[in-house]
């Protein structure tokens, strides 16, 4: 088995980091697992550092290459052999990314504790930044505030979105664009620490009364999010949850809205697996983490949650953010739009 993607390196090393160039799926090292041996393949400029600082308890034989020799992937294929599977395309190896992702679960107690801490820190950062933003700020400034607070905790962000006013209605992924903040602001990060992800979306409104159009869209999102959370029970089908989402949108008078954004998915070392709902065989498992990113035109909600040994828990909502309880088989306390 060849593991060249950064998220799979994070997983097999229990939080190690193969990154040099951040915005890239593959890292600067590969792990090869055979029946006899585990290998770390990297170029000499990175190999010793990764071996010393990023492998944690994983023992591997080091194979270091000079830049003018074989590529890391070619060397990995040579060691793995022609009947190998891989998380990236390399020569004749079978690409089996989703099968490899399935090995990440069930998650461990230690991974749960790391996710819980990351969720709590994320909640605190969103609350702090929300209280500090002001009308008229540029969206880049708000992004910088979020990224700075995460960086202080040694947390990186794979995604950061800041939307304001009409851009929240027009775009599902409002990258900062140099706009001044209006009354309505959407904040989103996909944060990562030790390879594990916490994807959160929160909203702020400046004023005494939230416009009905915004309030209605947000309420629909929360109700659908609560439904999805209620279905995160071991053995339930991902495809059935998608059917339920479609039904919820239709009942809310938005029958086409489900097509406009991914339905949500499993998270962890992979930032999000949003395609699980398309296969009728995929089932919810014990000890999984979830990222239900529910949108309706003008609103979005998203929290980190887990299905853990018979209980469901929202890890990114600690109670400091204004919230409301929703009933969907059980009670779910979900963040609301913060009014300032």
Regions found by a protein language model. Name each.
Residues 1-340:
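Active-site neighborhoods and metal-handling regions in enzymes and metal-associated proteins
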